[in-house]
């Protein structure tokens, strides 16, 4: 069965385009019906980020869930990992995060979590899609069995305490000047407060959401403002989260970016030395730099690769017993603490290492020299450009040209109509030639569709 709604990270699209109140209501009904298991009164936790359309989607989903007899617990703007944590903590049957993650305000999305706080499997999402295509009128609750909705107070404090508990009790951030960029998103209240409670000297940017400015020239996908602020304030470190705070990028005291691959290297080495790695290796995606793989090999650690998407990283971690994984983009999963990527908790693990070593972030967080990596995107309107013979030929030729001295990855995005072409290797000029040839072939195929 083809997936008409769900991508690699829930349902995502333009607000009042794909993501309409009608769809949100139907998702609430379908997911609510599917997760009403057992005889207890069923509950769902709903959180959101700060984009304007969040109100519209939130109320539509409340209508959907309550119409099938499920109670709704509204927590307001909260990080995605906080919603996952609260779903389990509140003994809910289901969790919902209304967010389009790092996208701009025009988009929105719906992420669903099971009762243990894990994202739903492909099979469960397919079951929801089947229900979305059916008429559910005859499955609605009777009048006396409709669900109730209420807003929950104190959830910010719950997440702050959860995050703080991931650090040793005797470790504080006293003496560290930290600039944090919350992307005008879901973490704008909780993360600065948590850092302050841990003893850091906190300078906050991206903490004035207005419904329109989420991820706009700020956050983990646009860290330039953070880099400038770190240098300006002579800070020790910068933390950039995205709109729903499930990914993080750091900036060292010189204003240089530390991406997800480097963060994985820092945490992996630290945890290995402390005996905290569950297995001698970590899990990352096919997008992680070959430099990370070589660094880990030097540490006696294995890099296990998965398809792109933090859910696939987590699935492999759980299946094979790893407790550290993530993506180059900054999704870092620490399964000892969280059931999904948690940008802030990942940042805290790095801050803990910095505090213990008492060395500058620039020395602690640049563990390897990344191989030159070229990533280009080709947008298309319709069809399947990757099925074109010319594209297949260009990919085959490119792989032969790299000949074991690099990697080539060509894939469709799981969240938008884009073909991503990534190449990396020791010879940057050769990699760029190979990528450009494939981009041209994909572009021609897309234009002919």
Curated annotation (Swiss-Prot):
SUPFAM superfamilies according to UniProt: Phosphoglucomutase, C-terminal domain, Phosphoglucomutase, first 3 domains
Listed EC numbers: 5.4.2.10
Annotated S-S bridges: none
Cofactor note: Binds 1 Mg(2+) ion per subunit.
Pfam families registered for this protein in UniProt: PGM_PMM_I, PGM_PMM_II, PGM_PMM_III, PGM_PMM_IV
Cofactors that this protein relies on: Mg(2+)
Gene Ontology biological process: carbohydrate metabolic process; peptidoglycan biosynthetic process; UDP-N-acetylglucosamine biosynthetic process
GO cellular component entries: cytosol
Residues found modified as Phosphoserine: 101
Catalytic residues as annotated in Swiss-Prot or TrEMBL: 101
Reactions the enzyme catalyzes: alpha-D-glucosamine 1-phosphate = D-glucosamine 6-phosphate
Annotated binding of Mg(2+), by residue: 101, 242, 244, 246
Modification after translation (UniProt): Activated by phosphorylation.
Swiss-Prot/TrEMBL keywords: Isomerase, Magnesium, Metal-binding, Phosphoprotein
MF terms in GO: magnesium ion binding; phosphoglucosamine mutase activity; phosphomannomutase activity
Family to which the UniProt record says this protein belongs: Belongs to the phosphohexose mutase family.
Purpose: Catalyzes the conversion of glucosamine-6-phosphate to glucosamine-1-phosphate.
NCBIfam families linked to this entry: glmM, PRK10887.1
Protein name per its UniProtKB record: Phosphoglucosamine mutase
Gene that specifies this protein: glmM
